[in-house]
Each structure stands twice: as C-alpha cells, then as structure tokens.
C-alpha cells in the first residue's frame, strides 16, 4: 500500500486546506493521506493559534488518514531545513507522493528543484551584507531559472523540490493551484476562503467570530470561538524579556542560531523595546529577515541550544496525533517497512531523550499559556 503526503501547519485549518485535502484524495484514490503537521510552534517562529490536538482532529475530519507531529527541530527552521526534514520523514513513512498548494501549478517543480539544488554548491558565500541571505539567494534563483519566483507558496514548493532532489527524489511531486486569499492579514469581503493569517489576525484583535463557520470546519470554528486565549508574541514578550535580562551573554551565546553578536544586541535593546514588534525592529538589520529573528527569539524564550537541536535531529521520532481506520490499516500493513520510530504515548522514559524530550520541554510553555496538557495523558485521536 502506497500513500500520499501533505506537509502542513493548519494554523488554523481553513477552506483552502480542505480543498488541498480533497485534491490529495483524488490523487490518492483508495490509498491513505498522511499529514506531517507542525506541533504547537510553527515555522515563522510563533506559537500556533490552537493546540496540535485540535488541529489534528480538524485534519482527520477533513479527510486525512494519519496525522503525525513534525518534530520541533524540523518545524521551527528556515524553509530549506523545514523541507528537508519533512520530506525525509515522509519517505521513511513509506509515502510515495507529495501534494502541495502553489500559486502556479504549471511550474515544473521537479526540474526547477534539480536546477536550484546546484546553486549552494556554486555560491556558498554571499558577500553583500546590505541584503539578507534570502534576498541574495532568491536573486540567484531568478538568475539560474530565468524568472523571478517570489510568491510564498511557490518559494516553499521549490524548497520541497530541492530537498526532494537532494534526498534522491523519493517522492513524486504534485503541485496544486491554491484557492482563496493570499497570505496577507486582511479578510476578504467576498468568498469563503480566507487566509490563515487573516483568521489569526481576526482572533488576536478580538473581532466577531460568527463567520468562522463559513471559513473552516464547523467543529474547529466552535473550538476557536470558545477558546479563551489566542497565543501571540505580545502575550509572550514579558517572558522573553525576563529570559534575556536574566541570562548571561555566555548563556545567550549557546542559543541555537545565535550568531555575530546578536546576543549583545538583544541584551541592549530588550530594555528599550515596549513590545515584541518594537524589539524586532530594534534588532533588525539587512542581514536578517524578520522570520529569522522571530525564530531566534523563540529559541531564546524556550532556551533551545545548539546541542538540543542536534540531539533532537539525530534522534528524531514521530508523535502520532491521530488516525482513521484506513490509517490504522496502513500502519499495520507497513510496520516492517517504516523506517522511523512512531510514538503514540508519551511516558517518562520516552520524554527524556531525542526529539520527544525537546517537544515535551518546549510544550510546557504552551501548556502554561493554554492550560491544557499536550503530551502526558494524551492518546492519538481516532475517527
């Protein structure tokens, strides 16, 4: 039995994601749909708007057959490492095809991925410090492939393609034209497909939630409407401020991705910034994107060191969040062929090492904010 994979955050899951799952079903036919979903922290360096369990349940109710949690050491990384870790894990799960949404599905992602994969070997050292690495990299991509690719889903799709090429192309790529709004924070006046960013923005600003049921599964909409806390950086900023102010320079230097004196800059500016947005502006330079600095701030808040990430990455396992009857059958039939450890229950032993140890530790802050246990005592959702 083969399987079709989706890499997702579902933060939150909305009508556009339901469309993608439906397209995946057309490709999978009778085979299962396997989702690798980021947990309680997402790639842009933030807490997810709702728990991984609620988002996994929404995915299962929308057509997924298996939902696994992407380890923190892959989920909170730049696009290249995010893609590499996710595709590697999908391949180890026996997934044969990858479905992903893009702005233009006519692009030959497999071909472009093979072309772009050669760029880092030829251009390892980007010297223009007046621009971010990502800006220079995107310019090099445009030069190599003959046209600019600057739409967010296309950029991520290319990262998938490059990672897939570098891993020996274990997955067949199926780009699907995405529907609905772009990635901006503004709700569209017409149409039922809103962006996840716009939905999060509505929730964080305390606006009317009565229309949520038109933009996402009703059960998920009800959970979000009743949720008392919506995690965001303004809520977390006092904790970050305490962490930076109470840490020594040596402690900060051990934080993952802390480089080029940023520990001094963070120490200096945290006293002056009134909120997280101002703090980011104060430490921002042309060498670093806001996404990179948000991730660094998250690593700092959670005290995630280089050693933590290395240990997690070298001992990755996958937490099973939920399954359907078809998903259970797939795991049973392919047990001997699956090349990664699957964990369905967190206990004291499994929580002490590898990716699960980092997951349990980082989830403690989410538990404090949301007031709901995320690991101990939880069992995979069955639909």
UniProtKB/Swiss-Prot annotation:
User: Does Phosphoprotein count among this protein's keywords?
Assistant: no
Q: Where in the cell is it found?
A: Cytoplasm
Sorted alphabetically, which keywords does the UniProt record give?
Answer: ATP-binding, Cytoplasm, Ligase, Nucleotide-binding, RNA-binding, tRNA processing, tRNA-binding
Q: Which residues bind ATP?
A: 7-20, 101, 153, 178-179
Cite a single GO MF annotation: ligase activity, forming carbon-nitrogen bonds
The protein's predominant localisation is cytoplasm
Q: Which SUPFAM superfamilies match?
A: Nucleotidylyl transferase (SSF52374)
Q: In its UniProt entry, what is this protein called?
A: tRNA(Met) cytidine acetate ligase
Q: Which organism is it from?
A: Lactobacillus acidophilus (strain ATCC 700396 / NCK56 / N2 / NCFM)
